[in-house]
A protein has these predicted regions:
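Hydrophobic alpha-helical membrane segments
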Residues: 1-293
Length: 293
């Protein structure tokens, strides 16, 4: 009498997963070719995009901005006013270093601040006119999973502030109270150069890891009734499957955001809504599917 193999179903499942994991992927499909799909069980499909995709997202975001200029630019104006007020308060308190550090760390919390712009992008895609009220008070933003993502980004932001403080404290025993003094120290002394390199590398690494987890997750949680871990996993997969286009997109977001802050936050009035709407386009391109109600 033959003995039944209790592990046969498990082995068959593992064999099927292994065959799927080792299926060939072409470089053409990843970087230069037409838009294709990569599927994984239990997670949404991920589209493979080419290196030109970030520029298409920017162009689409710019068009969307001028389909609803009043609410979108007002949203950007409110952000610029709040950002300027915080920076002014820190500078007036002789904490200019913190103003610089927190401005650089703005990229960590930007995905949650842009939630109203994702809502505007969704409305525009549906053929509706977004209003400032629905952008400021996004109904779906009250969901627990979005709150968890916001808490995660806030903790990352605070972690960045602590790391910046440690790097600065280990680099000098003096307190540079003005921006001019700090810039002079950073650019003209060996300790300042070391601080600049160390802080840039540490901040860049944290920023990129955070970007991988939230670039798709934030708009996805607004659009779909899914869990925060599923959204983060989908975001990481989107970056992994489109590494070079997404690296370019990260550079565009970072450079334009920080350059806007360098104008005294004035450029944020236009740039932030533009990038927020473009980010919605990026999500819809990377995670295709019908809009959720």
């Amino acid at each position: 009498m033959c003995r039944k193999d209790a592990y046969a179903p498990f082995r068959e499942h593992v064999t099927a997963l292994s065959a799927k994991a080792t299926a060939p992927l072409t470089a053409t499909g990843r970087l230069w070719g037409e838009r294709t799909l990569d599927t994984s069980g239990g997670l949404p499909d991920i589209a493979i995009v080419d290196w030109k995709a970030p520029f298409r997202w920017l162009a689409g975001g710019w068009r969307d901005l001028w389909k609803a200029p009043v609410p979108c630019l007002t949203y950007g104006l409110l952000l610029a006013i709040v950002s300027f007020g915080i920076a002014f308060a820190l500078i007036a308190s002789d904490a200019e270093f913190w103003a610089l550090a927190l401005t650089c760390g703005f990229v960590f919390v930007a995905p949650m601040i842009a939630m109203g712009l994702y809502q505007a992008g969704r409305s525009i895609e549906r053929g509706e006119k977004p209003t400032l009220g629905e952008m400021l008070f996004v109904r779906d933003a009250l969901r627990g999973d979005l709150a968890y993502l916001g808490l995660f980004l806030l903790l990352i932001y605070l972690l960045w502030g602590r790391i910046a403080q440690i790097v600065y404290g280990l680099s000098t025993y003096q307190l540079h109270r003005t921006v001019d003094d700090f810039v002079t120290f950073a650019l003209t002394t060996s300790d300042g150069n070391t601080m600049l390199v160390t802080g840039t590398l540490a901040g860049g690494l944290i920023a990129f890891l955070t970007y991988c987890g939230v670039v798709v997750a934030a708009p996805m949680l607004l659009d779909r009734n899914t869990g925060v871990f599923t959204a983060i996993a989908t975001s990481v997969r989107a970056v992994a499957e489109n590494f070079w286009p997404m690296l370019l997109w990260a550079a565009i977001l970072g450079v334009l955001t920080l350059a806007s802050a360098a104008t005294g936050f004035i450029a944020l009035i236009v740039v932030f809504p533009w990038l927020g709407l473009a980010s919605w386009r990026a999500y819809r391109d990377l995670v295709p599917g019908p809009l959720q109600e």
